[in-house]
């Protein structure tokens, strides 16, 4: 299903499928981010006049709101992989919807491949749907053996604004974004959504803007490491005056911030790239693709006509890549290889939109053999099955399995977010901050 931002894919399609009685089982919808999963479930529940957890619920790592009466369950992508590994026939599940499939995360690609095998071998009644506003639909439709349905939806017009000339090398990126935001603020009405690559850039732009905007303008950061309550506050309408939401790509898809009429796109995105030197992924900052720029601009046209200010020129726009790379091409395949081994099939036995590169998969399998997760023939070991139960990189899971619970805090610091990142303190104080996040240590 292809439809522009604001057409109603995320919040209308599951409810329409339920109303049409297309399946007697539960409808499972995958979202790439936890905030989007909760927000989508809450919006659908609000639409039908029920609290979350009745007909519509959600399940993400660490929390869930579902009940025996739940018919639509919104989950993050890793949840589906775990469900398939535990019960391959997906009992009580009638349909699986892959929302925002253009992001092509490893979990989404693997989940679709496993679901296709389940549908072919065990569940010929299982309905599979892939949705996006910017999907390269042809290859996906071919793998799914499914028709492409395109809807124009009812997104509002968004007027693009480009820079007159490329940014001078003497101007810092954050300053350029702040300048563009101030221009947009003076030329338009309504609240503003500013896209930045990461938390550091958000804080620096925040510092540049806070003394230049008027008292009726609220600045609201929005990034993945924030608590959910703070994220909810950021996407809520401004209580008075205007709001400037400074966000990472967390706000790129599946979210509607009601009073946003203006988008400022910094033109950069942060993605995970596999680093052979460290054997793990690292975050790199790259130019956005046309697909990502389209998604971002669409945030300004969700509820009314809007404007999108791009921090690049019209000429530079034509040089953007069409789509971001699939994670299966650029990311770390160690966890992916472990899941395949638990499943018991090689990649050649599954239908992937983009098959994994043989050499990079072999490297990942070699790491798993070194950790004791695979035997010499590449088969899963009991230790490997234990590693697969952790929502962690296999290296960190191995550390916990080997060193015991004392290693859990170090794994949490490495896998999630150091609460004292950027502060020069020793490990003991960092773990203390992790145990007591409300305690003031500095």
Describe every region a protein language model picked out.
Residues 335, 354, 369-375, 391-442:
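C-terminal helicase lobe and adjacent C-terminal extensions/tails of nucleic-acid helicase motors
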């Amino acid at each position: 299903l292809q439809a522009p931002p604001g057409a109603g894919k995320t919040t209308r399609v599951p409810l329409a499928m339920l109303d049409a009685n297309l399946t007697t089982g539960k409808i499972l919808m995958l979202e790439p981010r936890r905030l989007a999963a909760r927000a989508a479930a809450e919006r659908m529940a609000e639409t039908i006049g029920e609290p979350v957890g009745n007909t519509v619920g959600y399940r993400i790592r660490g929390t869930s709101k579902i009940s025996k009466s739940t018919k639509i369950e919104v989950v993050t992508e890793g949840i589906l992989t775990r469900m398939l590994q535990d019960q391959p026939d997906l009992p009580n599940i009638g349909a699986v919807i892959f929302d925002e499939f253009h992001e092509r995360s490893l979990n989404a690609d693997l989940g679709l491949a496993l679901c296709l095998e389940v549908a072919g071998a065990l569940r010929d009644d299982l309905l599979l749907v892939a949705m996006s506003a910017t999907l390269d639909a042809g290859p996906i439709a071919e793998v799914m053996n499914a028709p492409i349905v395109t809807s124009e939806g009812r997104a509002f017009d968004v007027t693009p604004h480009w820079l007159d000339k490329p940014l001078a090398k003497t101007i810092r990126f954050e300053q350029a974004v702040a300048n563009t935001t101030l221009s947009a603020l003076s030329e338009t009405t309504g609240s503003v959504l500013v896209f930045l690559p990461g938390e550091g850039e958000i804080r620096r732009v925040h510092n540049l803007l806070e003394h230049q905007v008027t008292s009726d303008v609220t600045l609201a950061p929005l990034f993945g490491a924030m608590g959910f309550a703070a994220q909810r506050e950021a996407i809520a309408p401004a209580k008075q005056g205007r709001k400037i939401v400074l966000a990472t790509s967390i706000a790129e898809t599946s979210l509607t911030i009601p009073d946003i009429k203006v988008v400022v796109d910094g033109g950069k995105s942060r993605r995970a790239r596999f680093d052979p030197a460290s054997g793990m992924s690292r975050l790199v900052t790259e130019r956005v693709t046309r697909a990502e720029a389209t998604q971002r601009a669409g945030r300004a046209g969700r509820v009314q006509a809007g404007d999108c200010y791009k921090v690049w020129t019209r000429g530079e726009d034509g040089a953007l890549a069409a789509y971001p790379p699939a994670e299966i091409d650029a990311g770390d395949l160690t966890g992916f290889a472990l899941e395949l081994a638990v499943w018991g099939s090689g990649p050649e036995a599954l239908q992937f939109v983009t098959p994994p590169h043989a050499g990079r998969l072999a490297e990942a399998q070699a790491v798993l053999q070194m950790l004791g997760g695979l035997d010499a023939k590449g088969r899963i070991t009991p230790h490997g099955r234990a590693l697969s139960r952790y929502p962690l990189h296999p290296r960190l899971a191995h550390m916990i399995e080997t060193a015991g619970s004392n290693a859990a805090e170090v794994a949490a610091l490495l896998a999630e977010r150091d609460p004292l990142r950027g502060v020069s303190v020793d490990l003991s104080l960092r773990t203390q901050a992790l145990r007591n996040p409300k305690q003031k240590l500095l």
